[in-house]
Amino acid sequence: MENKEKTHSIENFIGIYDNYISKDECNKAIEVFENQDKFNKTLDRIQFEDSPILVKQDKQYFAGPQNIKVWWQNLKSLIINFDVAFKHYAKHTGASDCYPDFHFTELKIQKTLKTEGYHTWHIEHGKGWGMEPRSFVFSV
């Protein structure tokens, strides 16, 4: 597999980090999701949020400490490369000055409607488990 040059740009606080996450790493994330979906380890938002079918039809898989043996080997390089890009972004936008200690608690892989792809990460910032305002949103 060819190693493509990693490039980045930040404009109006929107960061683009090309080739930090490889196609192979994306495919591994999709494979983890699909395998866990087969074992009914994903969440259907229609059921757990009682959402109307026309509003939310996505499914989610949460990779965290409780199931690390399932996903770590497949997603380790994706997480490392993501962290490199995120640290660069936080440093160059001033985010690390405002929020010096970021901790990743879970990885959320979300499968959306057909043609809408997969949503790999978002970070919530706030206290407690309630719905807090989002600080950063990432799509891979």
Predicted regions and their residues:
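Fe(II)/2-oxoglutarate oxygenase catalytic core
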Residues: 1-140
